[in-house]
UniProtKB/Swiss-Prot annotation:
First-tier enzyme category under EC: transferase
Ligand binding (UDP-N-acetyl-alpha-D-glucosamine): 91, 120-124, 160-163, 305, 327
Gene that produces this protein: murA
Binding-site residues for phosphoenolpyruvate, renumbered to this chain: 22-23
Name of this chain's protein: UDP-N-acetylglucosamine 1-carboxyvinyltransferase
CDD domains in alphabetical order: UdpNAET (cd01555)
Origin species: Salmonella dublin (strain CT_02021853)
HAMAP family associated with the record: MurA
GO biological process: cell division; cell wall organization; peptidoglycan biosynthetic process; regulation of cell shape; UDP-N-acetylgalactosamine biosynthetic process
Pathway involvement of the protein, from the record: Cell wall biogenesis; peptidoglycan biosynthesis
Length: 419
C-alpha cells in the first residue's frame, strides 16, 4: 500500500488549479445511462472512483472513452447488473439503479462499499424508487429493481435530507410518466449540477438548489456536452492548508458561491479572503489562525466534508474551538491520529473540543476515510519533523494529484510505493 512521507514545517503559498467536483462527476457519469445519444462530460477529475464508475458503465455495455473529456455512448447498454467486484469499493454505484430501471425497466446493484462512515443506508433510494412504481427486492446481496412499462411520477416527501437519494429519485423521474415533486430535497451544488446536466440532455427539471424539485417526465433523453463544476471541497481543503501554515494561496477554476459557509469561517479565523468570478485568494499575513466553532449540516450550512480540515485548523489555532458533526456518525476517526502528533482534543458525543497548540510533531498516522486522510496530510505539512501517512488509497479516491499540487505550494511531500 502506498504511503505519503511529509517533511515539515512548511509555509504553503502559491497558486493551485481546482479539479472538477468528484461529488458531481460521479452522479453525472451514472446519469449518462439515461441518454440514448452520445454525451461528452468535461472537467472530470482523474480519480479512483471515477475510473471505477467508467469501468462499471463499460461492463453495462456503454462505450466509454477518455481523451481529456469523458465520452459516453449508452445507446448499446445491454447488461443491467452492477456486480459486487466493482461496487464493493464505491458507494456511488447505487446511482446506476435509478437510470437502469427508468430506461430499461430493470436494474440490479450489489449493496455498496466506500468509506465506512456511520450508517449510510440505501433505504431512501429504495423507498423513492418504490414510490415511482418500481418493485424492489433485496436478494443475495443485490438490490433488484423492476417495473412494467414506465415509472410513474409521484409526490415524494423525503424522511431526511439525502444527497444520494435525491440524485436517484431525480434521475429516475426524468423518464417517468407524469410529474414528480421531491420535497425536502438536498440543495447541494452537486445536485444542481446533476440536474443541469440532465436538462442539457432534454430533461424538464425545476427547483434544483431548493428543497422542492419538480421533474416533468419525458419519453427519452438525447446527447449533449456538459462541464462539471469545480470541486468546492478540494478548494476548501487547499484554503485550509494555506490558513494553518500561515501562508497565502490563489485557487483558480474555483466557484466561490458554493463555499459561503466555509469562507465565512475562514474569515472568522483571521484569513484575508478575496473572490472573483472563478477564483478565491486567501492570505494569513503570517498570522496564526484563531479557533472557530463549526456545526456541520446539509447545504447551504457548513459541509461535513470540511469538518476534518477545520478540526485540524482548530488544533493549531489560538484558543479553543468546538466542532459539532450532525450529518454522519462516527466521523471523528482522524482525531486519535492527530493526537499522535501532539494535538489536544476531547470527543464528547458528536462534538470535538479542540485546544489549540503552537505546533504539531511528525508521527506515523493512518488514513481512515477520504476527508480525514486529507487532514492528516495537511497536518504533516505543518508539523515539526517527518510524518508518514498510511493507507492513502482513501485520498486517491477523492483528490486529484494532491501531492503534486501541495508540492507546487512548497510542501515537502513524496509518495512512497508500497509492497
Amino acid at each position: 500500500m502506498d504511503k505519503f512521507r511529509v517533511q515539515g514545517p512548511t509555509t504553503l503559498q502559491g497558486e493551485v488549479t481546482i479539479s472538477g467536483a468528484k461529488n458531481a462527476a460521479l452522479p453525472i457519469l451514472f446519469a449518462a445511462l439515461l441518454a440514448e445519444e452520445p454525451v461528452e462530460i468535461q472537467n472530470v477529475p482523474k480519480l479512483k472512483d471515477v475510473d471505477t464508475s467508467m469501468k462499471l458503465l463499460s461492463q453495462l455495455g456503454a462505450k466509454v472513452e477518455r481523451n481529456g473529456s469523458v465520452h459516453i455512448d449508452a445507446s448499446q447498454v445491454n447488461v443491467f447488473c452492477a456486480p459486487y467486484d466493482l461496487v464493493k469499493t464505491m458507494r456511488a454505484s447505487i446511482w446506476a439503479l435509478g437510470p437502469l430501471v427508468a430506461r430499461f425497466g430493470q436494474g440490479q446493484v450489489s449493496l455498496p462499499g466506500g468509506c465506512t462512515i456511520g450508517a449510510r443506508p440505501v433505504d431512501l433510494h429504495i423507498t423513492g424508487l418504490e414510490q415511482l412504481g418500481a418493485t424492489i427486492k433485496l436478494e443475495e446481496g443485490y438490490v433488484k429493481a423492476s417495473v412494467e412499462g414506465r415509472l410513474k411520477g409521484a409526490h415524494i416527501v423525503m424522511d431526511k435530507v439525502s444527497v444520494g437519494a435525491t440524485v436517484t429519485i431525480m434521475c429516475a423521474a426524468t423518464l417517468a410518466e407524469g410529474t414528480t415533486i421531491i420535497e425536502n430535497a438536498a440543495r447541494e451544488p452537486e445536485i444542481v449540477d446533476t440536474a443541469n446536466f440532465l436538462v442539457t440532455l432534454g430533461a424538464k427539471i425545476a427547483g434544483q438548489g431548493t428543497d422542492r424539485i419538480t421533474i416533468e417526465g419525458v419519453e427519452r433523453l438525447g446527447g449533449g456536452v456538459y462541464r462539471v463544476l469545480p470541486d468546492r471541497i478540494e478548494t476548501g481543503t487547499f484554503l485550509v492548508a494555506a490558513a494553518i501554515s500561515r501562508g497565502k494561496i490563489l485557487c483558480r477554476n474555483a466557484q466561490p458561491d458554493t463555499l459561503d459557509a466555509v469562507l465565512a469561517k475562514l474569515r472568522d479565523a483571521g484569513a484575508d479572503i478575496e473572490v472573483g468570478e472563478d477564483w478565491i485568494s486567501l492570505d494569513m499575513h503570517g498570522k496564526r489562525p484563531k479557533a472557530v466553532n463549526v456545526r456541520t449540516a446539509p447545504h447551504p450550512a457548513f459541509p461535513t466534508d470540511m469538518q476534518a480540515q477545520f478540526t485540524l485548523l482548530n488544533l493549531v489555532a489560538e484558543g479553543t474551538g468546538f466542532i459539532t458533526e450532525t450529518v454522519f456518525e462516527n466521523r471523528f476517526m482522524h482525531v486519535p491520529e492527530l493526537s499522535r502528533m501532539g494535538a489536544r482534543a476531547e470527543i464528547e458525543s458528536n462534538t470535538v473540543i479542540c485546544h489549540g497548540i503552537e505546533t504539531l510533531s511528525g508521527a506515523q498516522v493512518m488514513a481512515t476515510d477520504l476527508r480525514a486522510s486529507a487532514s492528516l496530510v495537511l497536518a504533516g505539512c505543518i508539523a515539526e519533523g517527518t510524518t508518514i501517512v498510511d493507507r492513502i488509497y482513501h485520498i486517491d479516491r477523492g483528490y486529484e494529484r494532491i501531492e503534486d499540487k501541495l508540492r507546487a505550494l512548497g510542501a515537502n511531500i513524496e509518495r512512497v510505493k508500497g509492497e
